[in-house]
Amino acid sequence: MKVAVLGAGAWGTALAGHLAARHDTLLWARDAALIAGLQARHENSRYLDGIALPDALRYDADLGAALAHGAADDALCVIAAPVAGLRTLCHAMRDAGCVPAHVVWVCKGFEADTHLLPHQVIAAELPEQQSNGVLSGPSFAREVGQSLPVALTVASVSAECRERTLAAFHHGAMRIYTGDDVVGVEVGGAVKNVLAIATGISDGLGLGLNARAALITRGLAEMSRLGVALGGRAETFTGLTGLGDLILTATGDLSRNRTVGLQLAAGRTLNDILGALGHVAEGVRCAQAVLALARAQSIDMPITQAVCGVLFDGIAPRDAVSGLLRRDARAE
């Protein structure tokens, strides 16, 4: 199978390395200097340093060439751009005059200005593209790059997209499950990042494992309430792309969103944290969108509201936690 991966950040690079072990894989980035470095060293020293990439993996800064590779009859196109760049990439794909027949995306979050999920952005920008889906689940790029075991879910209303994605990714240490709840999978992948900031704050304040467990459990309830209101199915949120991804992102030390919370608890400013991080922390980008959607649906999301208060309203982390503890008692 031919596979084109659009986006050479940490996640796109790790997935391309996995795919290249079995398939004819081309990794694209618009940054010619990044591509030149990949071609010279077979390592993404900018986003995934220390991980050797397969010799068979090819690289290109020409989007047209990458799209042609991913548009072959036996091909799959993987969009690994962040949500913030998804619409721009779709514009570029359309302008290139080559939209692959089968597309799967791996970005997580809501578009900041519109509060749209990735599938809604793609439907608006590439309406002719019908065989598409989302690949998501509990996964750190570095561990995938190290070929450590991982389980992911592809969700699509297209059986052909599910089967093609399964054929592309299900090998080696990667196990793929299939489903059709695109909305549920995307909401889980977005909201868990916000909740991971909350658990990072709690851990950074030294509030203990009991508090962490409470935040994860009640955070899952928030995720499920919003997801069902937006059209997802409740059972999706107890699976890999909901609870599984939440546990990993909230507790794993490789989590950028958890790191943001830890650093906020230590008294650092958000600008300083993001500047030092050097990578996208999607929880920061989409927290306000999550809260706005919850309010539009009249859904109570107190943990998400507390995170937004710390991120954007100058509320001290410890005061935000105190506010959660002072909430009126209620039935679970």
UniProtKB/Swiss-Prot annotation:
Q: Give the EC number(s) listed in the UniProt record.
A: 1.1.1.94
Q: In which pathway does it act?
A: Membrane lipid metabolism; glycerophospholipid metabolism
A single GO cellular-component term from the record reads: cytosol
Binding-site list for sn-glycerol 3-phosphate: K108, G137, S139, K192, D245, S255, R256, N257
Q: Where in the cell is it found?
A: Cytoplasm
Q: What is its main location?
A: cytoplasm
Q: What is this protein called?
A: Glycerol-3-phosphate dehydrogenase [NAD(P)+]
